[in-house]
Amino acid sequence: MVRRTLLQAALRAWVIQCWWRSMQAKMLEQRRRLALRLYTCQEWAVVKVQAQVRMWQARRRFLQARQAACIIQSHWRWHASQTRGLIRGHYEVRASRLELDIEILMT
C-alpha cells in the first residue's frame, strides 16, 4: 500500500514536472517571438528613415543643380542677346554634378 502511494506520488510529481517544463518552453518561445517582432519593427523603421534621408539628400542635390543650370542659362541668354551670337549648348544634370557643353558662334 505504501509502495503504491509512493509510486502514485512520484508519477504525479513527474506529470507536474513535465507540465512545468512545457510551460517554461512555451513562455520562452513567446518571449523569443516578441523580441524578434520588436527587432524586426525597429529594423524596418531604421530602413524607412534611411530611405527618407537619402531621398531628401538626392532631392536637395537635384534642386541645387537645377538652380545652377537656370542661373547659367539666364546669364548666357543675356550674354547672347548682347552679342547677338548663336549659342548652342547641352547640359546634363547628374546626381552629384552638372555637365555643361556650350558652343558660341559669333556672326
Curated annotation (Swiss-Prot):
Highest taxon of source: Eukaryota
Any GO molecular function: calmodulin binding
Cysteines paired by S-S bonds: none
Keyword vocabulary terms for this entry: Repeat
A Pfam family: IQ
InterPro entries: IQ_motif_EF-hand-BS (IPR000048), IQCF (IPR039887)
Keyword Repeat tagged: yes
The UniProt record lists the keyword Zinc-finger: no
Ranges for domain IQ: 42-71
Coiled coil: none
Entry protein name: IQ domain-containing protein F6
